[in-house]
């Protein structure tokens, strides 16, 4: 997909990288950003600078941008006052029960070399058992750069692992071990998640011996766009304040029922104190990508064939609100052209899921694969069907 972004108008803080193998190192400073410009479309940075929390040295994140309207402050109007609704108390999750259910599904992934039959570890991360056949999900950045891998189960058993395949675009990978009595994790869904929903991270931080660790928090944001490297941007990420540290990459983020809602992938570490922010790849993307890797050794990705930007509508109080993706270009021979999508159209939904911004369109397309057929809703009321190309 062709994507266009405006340059960032705001300065961003400097972040530090952190991995289980490299400790703490200062990040390169984020370059100053140009001043805010008012020229019809306004832009602010979207993604935090983050670090991957596993093998291979921290990658310094930089800003990705998408267009946003100005923040407008006005005096309160009596007719628009909204009365806060009382919040009923809810039962806290039974974290002991969640731990008992999830920990057997979490493994430590050690990556290194084995030149003379002796395994030499160079870094470590976490993994999640997907099935009884021994397929294990982890992050691509955990396994890249190594020539050998082994897996340590929660009960201490150690197995050599084969790399089935990787997908750098989503930073996912699949390892496989031949072992009995595995405990596959139960997959959940992110569809019903709201900010404040309990979230529990289970992984192998710092490569510590003794089995996985559990930390508790909430889902603190949804649909984050996160850049973890020069060419790696992750979309639709879950944000959590459940502590995620070095070595936790590839571990699980689960809900109060112990069901997988994401694979922990990155953590924000800032020199100005912006900490306690972790990011997880949503389970829907994990399920699609790992299933394809298990079946074919690689994952496909959908290509619609448009270039565009977030479109904004003026609203009655003088502000503006995102309302879809304004199509700026349509590639010849693309799935978009075949569906009759034209420059000037505004995409508002994919398969019934609302799309208000460019990053939401990318997230929706990453949930499906190349060759899949989708329905695309347009602002003028049309709903078109097209088969997505593969890249």
Where are the predicted features?
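Intrinsically disordered, low-complexity cytosolic tails and juxtamembrane linkers
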Residues: 16-40
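Serine-dependent protease modules
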Residues: 2-15, 37-314, 332, 362, ...
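PDZ-domain C-terminal substructure recognizer with occasional recognition of PDZ-binding tails
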Residues: 162, 291-298, 337-342, 348-354, ...
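Active-site lining segments that contact anionic ligands and/or coordinate catalytic metals
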Residues: 301-303, 322, 371-373
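Structural motif
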Residues: 154, 255-256, 317, 350, ...
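A diffuse structural propensity rather than consistent per-protein peaks
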Residues: 112, 356-357
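PDZ/PDZ-like domain segments forming the peptide/carboxylate-binding groove
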Residues: 242-243, 251-252, 307-349, 354-356
């Amino acid at each position: 997909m062709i994507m266009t972004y405006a340059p960032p108008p705001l300065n961003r803080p400097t972040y530090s990288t952190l991995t289980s193998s490299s400790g703490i190192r200062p990040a390169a400073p984020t370059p100053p950003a140009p001043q805010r410009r008012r020229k019809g479309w306004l832009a602010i940075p979207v993604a935090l600078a983050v670090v991957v929390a596993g093998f291979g040295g921290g990658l310094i994140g930089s800003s990705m941008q998408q267009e946003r309207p100005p923040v407008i402050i006005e005096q309160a109007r009596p007719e628009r006052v909204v009365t806060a609704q009382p919040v009923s108390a809810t039962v806290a999750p039974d974290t002991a029960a969640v731990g008992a259910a999830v920990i057997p599904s979490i493994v430590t992934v050690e990556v290194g070399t084995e030149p003379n039959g002796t395994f030499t570890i160079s870094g470590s991360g976490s993994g999640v058992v997907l099935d009884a056949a021994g397929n294990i999900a982890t992050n691509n950045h955990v396994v890249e750069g190594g020539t050998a891998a082994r897996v340590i189960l929660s009960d201490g058993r150690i197995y050599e692992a084969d790399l089935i395949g990787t997908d750098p675009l989503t930073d996912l990978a699949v390892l496989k071990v031949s072992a009995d009595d595995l405990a596959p994790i139960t997959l959940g869904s992110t569809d019903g998640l709201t900010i404040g929903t309990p979230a529990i991270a289970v992984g192998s931080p710092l490569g510590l011996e003794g089995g996985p660790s559990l930390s508790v928090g909430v889902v603190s944001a949804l649909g984050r766009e996160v850049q973890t490297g020069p060419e790696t941007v992750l979309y639709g990420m879950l944000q959590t304040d459940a502590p995620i540290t070095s070595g936790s990459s590839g571990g699980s983020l689960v809900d109060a029922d112990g069901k997988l809602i994401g694979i922990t992938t990155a953590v924000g570490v800032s020199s100005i104190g912006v900490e306690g922010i972790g990011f997880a790849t949503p389970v829907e993307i994990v399920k699609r990508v790992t299933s394809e890797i298990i079946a074919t050794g690689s994952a496909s990705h959908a290509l619609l064939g448009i270039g565009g930007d977030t479109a904004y509508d003026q609203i009655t109080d003088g502000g503006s609100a995102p309302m879809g993706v304004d199509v700026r270009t349509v590639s010849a021979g693309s799935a978009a052209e075949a569906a009759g999508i034209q420059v000037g159209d505004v995409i508002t939904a994919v398969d019934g899921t609302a799309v208000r911004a460019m990053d939401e369109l990318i997230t929706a397309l990453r949930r499906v694969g190349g060759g899949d057929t989708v329905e695309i809703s347009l602002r003028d009321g049309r709903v078109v069907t097209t088969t997505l190309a593969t890249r």
